[in-house]
Regions:
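Cytosolic, long alpha-helical scaffolding segments
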Residues: 1-144
Length: 144
């Protein structure tokens, strides 16, 4: 019997997955920093809608990682990955709509600059969640 613990997946995959998880938290922090640095006094309704999608993405990532702990027997990994990808697509659409609205309806250049950055980083949060899901999918494929 081996006396050392051998993880069910490669170390490189664990490192890659943990880096993508860390990126999610970094991107969320980046949104908050943009709000603070831009001195945004009120939150735009479009930002609230995008934030709701980011929260849903993060919740699905949490569910995915919980299911991933026993990925060989998990029945809902594929569904969670699909849901995260769909949420990221929703985020892309909201991003485009928000940016269009910002650039066509707003006349204050400072407001445009601040909210452009915030929208970009909200969208990057959803992208980061999708990267976690893609990495989980890749690891499952390699180890099934």
């Amino acid at each position: 019997l081996a006396k050392e613990f051998i993880p069910p997946i490669e170390r490189e995959d664990i490192v890659e997955l943990s880096q993508h998880i860390d990126t999610v938290t970094d991107k969320v922090e980046d949104v908050l920093l943009r709000i603070y640095m831009g001195n945004a006094q009120e939150i735009e309704p479009d930002a609230l809608e995008m934030t709701d999608v980011v929260i849903q993405c993060c919740e699905k990532v949490r569910e995915l990682l919980t299911a991933f702990a026993d990925f060989r027997r998990s029945k809902n990994l594929k569904d969670l990955i699909i849901q995260i990808n769909a949420l990221e697509e929703t985020s892309d659409k909201l991003f485009m709509q928000s940016m269009r609205k910002l650039h066509t309806e707003c006349t204050d250049p400072l407001h445009i600059i601040v909210w452009r950055e915030i929208y970009i980083y909200l969208e990057r949060c959803a992208d980061a969640c999708e990267h976690v899901a893609d990495t989980v999918e890749s690891v499952v494929m390699k180890n099934s």
